[in-house]
Amino acid sequence: RADEVGLGTIVCADTVDELMAIAKLSPNLLVAEPTELIGTGKTSDENYVTQTIKSVREINPDIMVLQGAGIKNGQDVYDTIMLGAEATGSTSGIFCADDPAAMVEEMIHALRAAWDEKHKA
């Protein structure tokens, strides 16, 4: 119904199984975010990031996958995008930074650098 009225859908999930079940509903964006890591400054391990993206893409390659939880700086953003995520989340990483505006800028630059690196001609 959301598509019919022009609304985008974003759904958060914790586990690979949850993400796979939700992917069958075809949201526009899935947020892969292990609950136990939210606000800890500890990012998901590489296996979780790659497995969640792979699992969602096998069901519906049109769903964007955002990785959340523990993203605290530009390097975390860069690394996560390089693993295949289309985006990252970062609430605590920004709001707990000494200079939140500078952290947003750092993260945006890291996103751009990773995007450019992944899409080199």
Where are these regions (language model features)?
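Catalytic cores of alpha/beta
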Residues: A13-S26, L66, G70-S90
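Aromatic-rich, lipid-facing transmembrane alpha helices and their immediate juxtamembrane interface loops
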Residues: I53, I59, I71, I108-A110, ...
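A structural alpha-helix within SAM-dependent methyltransferase catalytic domains
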Residues: D3, A23, R57, Y78-I81, ...
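Conserved anion-binding
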Residues: R1-S55, I59-N60
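Generic structural signal for well-ordered alpha-helices
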Residues: L19, V49-K54, V77-Y78, A101-I108
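Glycine-rich phosphate-binding active-site loops on the catalytic face of alpha/beta enzymes
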Residues: L30-K42, L83-V104
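C-terminal helical cap(s) of enzyme catalytic domains, especially alpha/beta-barrels
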Residues: R1-E4, E46, S92-A121
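Short glycine/serine/threonine/alanine-rich loop segments
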Residues: L7, I63, A85
